[in-house]
Each structure stands twice: as C-alpha cells, then as structure tokens.
Amino acid sequence: MTQTSATTTLPTLRRRATLRRSLGLLADFRFEQSDPDRFYGHLAADTVSILSDIWADAGPTTSAGRASLAGTRILDVGGGPGYFGQAFAAAGVDNYVTCEPDVGEMAAAGIRLASSVRGSGMDLPFADEAFDLTYSSNVAEHVSDPWRMADEMLRVTRPGGLMVYSYTCWLGPFGGHETGLWQHYVGGGFAARRYEKTHGHPPKNRWGESLFNVSCADGLQYAQTLQDRGDAELVASFPRYHPSWAWWMTKVPGLREVGVSNLVLVLRKR
C-alpha cells in the first residue's frame, strides 16, 4: 500500500504540529459534553489552522506565492452547530459553506450561519466540481457508509482541488467517544450499556446507529483505490492530533490502529 509522508509534503503544518498543541487539544477532550463551546471552539480554530497550512503547502501556487484560503471555495461536510463557520469567519474566509443533515445539531449552539445548507453527506446537494477544498472533521465514524460520503466529497471537488478527510479510528483510545477510553475495546454495545447505567441516559453517540467501527486501514485502502483508479492522488496521511515527530505511526500496521487516534487523508483530485 502506497503512503505519502506528510513530513516532506506538508512542511508548514509539520512546524505547527508541536507537543504543546497536542497536549492542549488533549486537555480539551474532557469538556466535549460538559462545555461544548470550549471544546468545539478550540477544535474549530485548530481545524482552520490545519486547513490553512495544508492549502498553503499543497494547494495551487499563485503569483503571490503560496495559496491562501481567502477566496477559496470551501465545503465543510457535517459542520454541526456552527463553530467551524465562526472560526473560518474569524480567519477572514468568506466563501465557506457547511452541509449538515441534522436540524437539531445545526441549532444546538444557537449559532446562525447564512452559509448553512441542510443535506446529507451521502448525497451532497451541490454540482460536480463546485468547490476548491472540501473537508470533513470527525464525521466519518458517525455514518454507516463513510466511503460513499468521501466519494461525494470528491465529486464536488474541482480537479486539482483538495479533499481533507479526518476521522476518529475505532481502536484508538477515543474511538468510543464519550463512553470512555477503554470500554469500547470490550465492544460498542457494552460501552453504550455501561455508559447508560453510569449516567442514567444513553450516550449521544449510539453504537450501530450513529457510531461505527472505522479503521486506519480502511481509510488508507480507500485512498489507494482512488490512486489506482486515477481519481485522486494521496498527498499525505498523518495523525491529526499528534506532534509531527510521531507521524510515522501511520506507516505501521497494527500500531496505527491503536496509536493514531484520528487519521487525516489529504487527497488531490485528478
């Protein structure tokens, strides 16, 4: 299986991916349910920084030098309640669209975005090649067919544009989401039942309904299939939350499933 090293192809992002950043994101994880503004606000700002660096390193070269997100047509698939839209606006990006299927999720934080479109990632309501950059952040593990969603994202990405696909790997410590760090290793059903017994209500992410087993190998194989078909080029694959000196984990079968936690695939459409 062919893999591209992010350490050589994404130098700007590599410099940003420090241990301090990783520890800060890790510290925020415990606030996902109790203080979503803090958790998702910081995550959204970090996501904008990641995409800005990826676009600078792997996007089109302009007469002014490296590409900027300003003026770039961006689609966020599964953008949720608006934290990401706010972060893009704060960064000066005004050509951002988010597509979210759940009305309740869209309104959860009380954030109103004129650029929000209700629709399914499995059947995106956009024309072919409509966007320069499409991305999905922590959505793939919540849909029953993540690779159909990825195909849809690639469809609406223009040739030469980028698709960034980031998702939580099931066998990583956060694969079970709010159900705990180890319970999902026993099984998704067990983790959900134990959570409900402990907290008196079922988890937000329900095993087999809105939470699924997606592996690192699944994503890397998908990227390889796209390359073999000539549909896209794998620009890079790396662990989203790790410092750059730990990005080598994506190359080691077995270890990557438990050590990567969240895999990022950067694909350039051909």
Locations of regions flagged by a protein language model:
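Short, flexible loop/turn elements at secondary-structure junctions
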Residues: 103, 138-139, 241
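Acidic-residue sensor for enzyme active/binding pockets
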Residues: 100, 141, 152
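A short SAM/SAH-binding and catalytic strip from SAM-dependent methyltransferases
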Residues: 133-144
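Adenine-nucleotide cofactor-binding loop residues
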Residues: 122, 140, 171
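Conserved N-terminal segment of class I S-adenosyl-L-methionine
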Residues: 1-123, 135, 259-264
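S-adenosyl-L-methionine-dependent methyltransferase catalytic module, highlighting the catalytic core
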Residues: 144-152, 158, 162-266
